[in-house]
Amino acid sequence: MKKFGKVVVKLRIPILVLSFLLLIPSVLGYFNTRVNYDILYYLPSDIDTMQGQDILLDDFGKGAYAMVVVDGMNKSNVSKLVKKVEGVDHVASVISYSGVVGDDVPSEILPDKFRSYFENEDSGATLFAIFFDDTTSSDDTMKAIQEVRDVTDNQCYIAGMSAVVTDTKTMAEKETPFYVLVAVVLVCIVLAIFMDSFLVPVFFMLSIGMAIVYNLGSNYFLGEVSYITKALAAVLQLGVTLDYSIFLWHSYKEAKEETTDDHHEAMAVAIGNTLTSVVGSSITTVAGFIALCFMSFTLGLDLGVVMAKGVVLGVIGCVTILPSLILTFDKALEKTMHREIMPNFDKPARWIVNHSWIFLIIFVLLLGPAIYGYNNTKVYYDLSDTLPEKLNCSQANKMLAENFDGTNSIYMILADSNLSAEDSNAMMNEVNGLDGISFALSIDSALGGEIPTEMLPDSLVSELKGDEYQIMMVSTNYTIASDEINDQINKVDAIAKKYDAKSMVIGEAPCTKDLITITDKDFKTVSAVSIVAIFFIIFFVLKSISLPVILVAAIEFAIFVNMGIPYYTGTTIPFISSVVIGTIQLGATVDYAILMTTRYKRERAAGNSKKEAISIALGTSIPSIIVSALGFFAATFGVGMIASVDMIASLCTLMARGAIISMFVVIFVLPSLFVLLDKVIIHTSLGFKPKKNSQN
């Protein structure tokens, strides 16, 4: 490893030149990487709801759809508005009152129930549906949503997933640069205070920043990334890989003091030591992210690949770019050195070790409530419900519910186009009889027997009936992702299949129901895979059977406490929190744990007694653990405070709190477990037994 360090030191200038040149293609790649704002897009392609979406697109030329509420406009002006909307690029069709019956049919002869589908006479609100010719999250659909708003002078409110995706994109694009800025500023403040140089945080940020740009730029080769991945990747990479930079700096200072005054030689030694120490902890972090790739909900694959790649690039940057920067600006660094405010922790470490029984009791007392809270914390799946109320899509959902019989969402049934009018009417009657249904209608049932179907325009019939399938609309009063709507969808699906075995229930609500079912299974798989992977990595790194169990148990305890707190505070968190936070907190905390355990092993092997070895390991590790944890906290806490997208804000808040909880667990609980289980550890591990007789 030292040979590699010498090569880096020798080639430091070419390394810096190359690293800056690589920023050019990386920046180009970053700006040309498409971002996907639709969470439901990541559902498996082989489930009914996703196959139904494909049929809708292939057979009807319709992908996304939206419900539009127009407030306080007369019928004539609504008709003009509809014609404007029909002229927007990528609008496949519009289904409206005038489109169904034409302008020549007197409204008085229409059934009151039919009119109520489109008009609320009391409030003056009018409803019509827009179908787009591309998928929910496509660039064309999002442009069409915005253009519809523009051509109607924002006189309409567009509800549905397409509108949510469009507004989320607008908001995320404005805020994401501020996430990075806030994270960098706060981390620099923490490092400037707790480290011994005012300038070194700048070089940390420059080195890590380059690795982040390389990572985000290389996402171009993935085709596209989720907006969640894009928003979190930079902040997470900063928080997770900061440890490596801190370790290199400390190793460099130690090498200068202990081995030589030759800064080049000291850096070569520091690079070698950093690689040796960081490889094990970085592999565990990468393993945690790779575990996300085992999800059938492929957002896990998206986030897992990007973050694993980011950790690898972070390690490479830490042992190439950062040493080159430090040596190049060594004199400037010397001039900005200041006294460390971090005290000596030898006495606190001895006190913790001598009073380990206190922390073991706390550990046991908190474990049960933490696990219970973790298993019972409420989560939400309907992302639109957490967006700011000022957004057009949020106002539209409210208008839809207030003006049209409490309607919260509209989904569809794809049924056989040759289904008889009798069966179609019977199916719709059964669906309309279910609790929580505002209306269910097909072409055959819409006008009942009072107006013959032949009176409908051929263009409308062709919009709703294809060669193989026909579209039936179902409006629900229930909230998306609620138990009530999921039960309702099951009943609607059963009714539809009674009349047509090949029918499918599709739309946002059915997709969200599938999301709940699939991710529940996925999260259990990821949790098991990540724990097993990290268990075996710790086993090989520390050459121990017992230590993987002890370390994983301590870290999982920290995760249970973090994820259990929302239950006791009555906070509802995003559905993906448990797997993302669990993976990240596990991967980040294991760095602290391995750092202290490695020193404990070295001191035990050197002949120190149990308590002396643990005290030395703890006392020397506490400063690094505190700085690293506070750095991660700073990187995520600020983003959690400013993010308007609740999913991003919640995830960052959980990560920030998790960093602090993990810090306390590693400082207080882990050494206490070492004290309790020292005999087990030294008899089930290689390299722990004292080389000479000493008191245990």
Give the label of every model feature segment.
Residues 45-65, 70-162, 378, 384-547, ...:
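Structured non-transmembrane domains adjacent to transmembrane bundles in polytopic membrane proteins
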Residues 1-35, 41, 136-381, 497-696:
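Membrane-embedded transmembrane helical bundles of large multi-pass transporters/channels
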Residues 35-38, 102-104:
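Surface-exposed, low-hydrophobicity interaction/linker segments
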